[in-house]
A protein has these predicted regions:
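N-terminal leader/signal peptides at the extreme start of proteins
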Residues: 1-4
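Long, compositionally biased, intrinsically disordered regions
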Residues: 10-225
């Protein structure tokens, strides 16, 4: 399944300069299956019993993961904006008073994880669709680990789920989705630009932005406010 979304990365320079460059990011997701079982005697039955629930969780993880990448990209890498930000534009300051405030890649990954931890619940809907069919389902808390690479974002989610029906009980806990995204490439370019800005705080290297964008096949737009 292919989807396209637009991710826009914003950079605020000093008190009055806002540099924005927009990136079109293709998003394509696929879920990686996890093995499920309860006991040697019931492993086939339990696995078949849990398949629809497992597929449902993975579908929600895929959808929420795509939404996370778009939302984070449109808000400068943040799920929750830091104090040093522009409230009206809902964007963080990356460069302020000659100091770089660009978040680290680890912090970016944490922001994505926080999005999944808080938003996956809404897609799952407390498994109401299954409970109405007679399933007895209990779920624990969501805990996500995110890894951003050059062309991919991988979400690994721990979500304890117990599925019961009749005499069969099945447990699930591990789910993962890899989403094709150039978020890592975008971040690397922003980091390169911030390093340039720290070395030359009195000016903006417009030529650098253009050249680096072309080399990475990224479309850039710049605005001054």
């Amino acid at each position: 399944m292919s989807k396209k979304g637009q991710v826009t990365v914003f950079m605020v320079l000093g008190f009055i300069s806002l540099l924005v460059f927009g990136i079109i990011v293709g998003i394509r997701s696929y879920s990686q299956e996890q093995s499920v079982g309860s006991s040697q005697e019931q492993i086939l039955e339990a696995s078949q019993f849990a398949v629809p629930v497992k597929s449902y969780v993975e579908s929600c993880l895929e959808k929420t993961g795509e939404e996370a990448i778009v939302f984070i990209g449109e808000h400068g890498g943040y799920y929750k904006l830091p104090k040093l930000s522009e409230p009206q534009l809902e964007l963080p300051y990356y460069f302020y008073d000659n100091i770089s405030y660009l978040l680290t890649k680890e912090e970016l990954e944490k922001q994505l994880s926080n999005y999944i931890d808080n938003e996956l619940f809404f897609c799952l809907g407390n498994f109401g669709i299954f409970k109405r069919q007679g399933y007895n389902i209990k779920q624990g808390d969501v805990s996500t680990i995110t890894k951003v690479t050059e062309n991919k974002v991988k979400f690994e989610v721990n979500l304890p789920v117990e599925v019961a029906g009749g005499t069969t009980l099945s447990s699930l806990d591990s789910f993962s989705t890899s989403i094709s995204s150039r978020l890592g490439t975008i971040y690397d370019m922003v980091q390169k630009l911030m390093n340039e800005q720290v070395q030359n705080p009195g000016s903006i290297c417009v030529g650098c932005i253009t050249i680096w964008g072309i080399k990475r096949d990224l479309r850039t737009e710049m605005y001054y406010l």
